[in-house]
């Protein structure tokens, strides 16, 4: 059942949709994470995978940064490999390493063995979403998933990779196997996001963390059609959709093609390597922008933070003047674990003042 709320006063939802928000909206990727002592206390008793499949922990961890920082959106606590695990792929998230796949996907037979995601396998996620929409008041909840390319990279490499050489070799040299893999992962991503939408999330974001390793030509040929199908399949729910990657300056136009044109508010995330004003010229008309403070800035002392935050807000306003339909303040990537939570709280307050 669709239990989504009406949130007409939400600055986040207003900015994405091209309406004038009451204030500059702000939230931060990985706002629920190791920067928070309350998060570390919970995680000391549970593995990452245990936490991602426990409705009580998902709910509590998602709420922690909203309580502490007063951000304008909550993002569901999860991990991009959760739907892979739920689909039966043997993997774990190893501390200080990341996702590790027990049996990497390297052949056409390996791809054929990938099973669809049954929605019942992510029931704890749906249960947590139902609770969260009842507890968040007027704060919207963002659901998310990893994009097919980034999931494919983890599966083919067997874990994090610097050069993604096996992934690119399959993509370029075994095209039929590659597209079969991307089709299977696109279906899994759609199923995971649909379960979140059906449970009541107010928006979705798709993370293509490793897309920046690709040339524009390769992205358009081997990735864009699959990512576009994710967004096209979810558009009927009517929720705003965001597409984010790291190091994707040359891909911003193509990434906006994937997320726009579906009849719902669309946004593209921008990292700190590209100004928001430049991004506005690269994305399709009708696209909002999210970003783009360098996460490391939050470690550099308050005078540096304040100066950089003001610069991002000003750049966001210039981007809107240049054609972006709205701006949501965020980091260019996730909050670093060493970040002082008080600095995050002060950053949120400063953005709200500007």
From Swiss-Prot:
GO terms under cellular component: cytosol
PANTHER family with a match to the protein in the record: METHYLTETRAHYDROFOLATE:HOMOCYSTEINE METHYLTRANSFERASE RELATED, UROPORPHYRINOGEN DECARBOXYLASE
Binding-site positions, substrate: 30-34, 79, 154, 209, 333
EC number(s) given by UniProt: 4.1.1.37
Positions of the record's site feature: Transition state stabilizer: 79
Subcellular location: Cytoplasm
Entry keywords, A to Z: Cytoplasm, Decarboxylase, Lyase, Porphyrin biosynthesis
Pfam entry (one): URO-D
InterPro entries, A to Z: UROD/MetE-like_sf, Uroporphyrinogen_deCO2ase_HemE, Uroporphyrinogen_deCOase
Name under which the protein is recorded: Uroporphyrinogen decarboxylase
Family per record: Belongs to the uroporphyrinogen decarboxylase family.
Keyword Lyase: yes
Quaternary context: Homodimer.
GO molecular function: uroporphyrinogen decarboxylase activity
Keyword Transcription regulation: no
Chemical reaction(s) catalysed: uroporphyrinogen III + 4 H(+) = coproporphyrinogen III + 4 CO2
A biological-process GO annotation: protoporphyrinogen IX biosynthetic process
Pathway: Porphyrin-containing compound metabolism; protoporphyrin-IX biosynthesis; coproporphyrinogen-III from 5-aminolevulinate: step 4/4
Function: Catalyzes the decarboxylation of four acetate groups of uroporphyrinogen-III to yield coproporphyrinogen-III.
PROSITE patterns for this protein: UROD_1, UROD_2
Superkingdom as given in the UniProt entry: Bacteria
């Amino acid at each position: 059942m669709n239990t989504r709320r009406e949130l007409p006063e939400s600055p986040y939802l207003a900015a994405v949709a091209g309406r004038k928000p009451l204030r500059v909206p702000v939230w931060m990727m990985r706002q629920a994470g190791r920067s928070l002592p309350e998060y570390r206390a919970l995680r000391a008793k549970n593995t990452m995978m245990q936490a991602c499949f426990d409705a009580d922990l998902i709910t509590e961890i998602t709420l922690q940064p909203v309580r502490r920082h007063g951000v304008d959106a909550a993002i569901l606590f999860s991990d991009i490999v959760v739907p892979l695990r739920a689909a039966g792929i043997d993997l774990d998230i190893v501390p200080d390493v990341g996702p590790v796949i027990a049996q990497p996907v390297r052949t056409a037979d390996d791809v054929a063995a990938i099973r669809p995601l049954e929605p019942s396998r992510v029931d704890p996620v749906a249960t947590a979403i139902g609770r969260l929409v009842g507890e968040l008041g007027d704060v919207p909840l963002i659901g998310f998933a990893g994009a097919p390319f980034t999931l494919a990279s983890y599966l083919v490499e067997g874990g994090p990779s610097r050069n993604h050489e096996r992934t690119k070799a399959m993509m370029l040299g075994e095209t039929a196997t590659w597209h079969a893999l991307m089709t299977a992962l696109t279906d899994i991503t759609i199923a995971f996001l649909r379960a979140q939408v059906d449970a009541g999330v107010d928006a979705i974001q798709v993370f293509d963390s490793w897309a920046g390793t690709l040339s524009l030509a390769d992205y358009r040929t081997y990735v864009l059609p699959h990512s576009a199908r994710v967004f096209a399949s979810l558009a009927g729910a009517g929720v705003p959709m965001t597409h984010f990657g790291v190091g994707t300056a040359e891909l911003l136009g193509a990434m906006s093609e994937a997320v726009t044109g579906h009849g719902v508010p669309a946004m593209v995330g921008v990292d700190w390597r590209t100004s928001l004003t430049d991004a506005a010229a690269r994305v399709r008309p009708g696209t909002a922008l999210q970003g783009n403070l360098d996460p490391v800035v939050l470690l550099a002392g308050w005078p540096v933070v304040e100066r950089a935050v003001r610069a991002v807000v000003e750049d966001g306003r210039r981007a809107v003047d240049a054609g972006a339909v709205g701006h949501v303040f965020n980091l260019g990537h996730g909050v670093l674990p060493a970040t002082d939570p008080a600095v995050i709280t002060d950053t949120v307050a400063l953005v709200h003042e500007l």
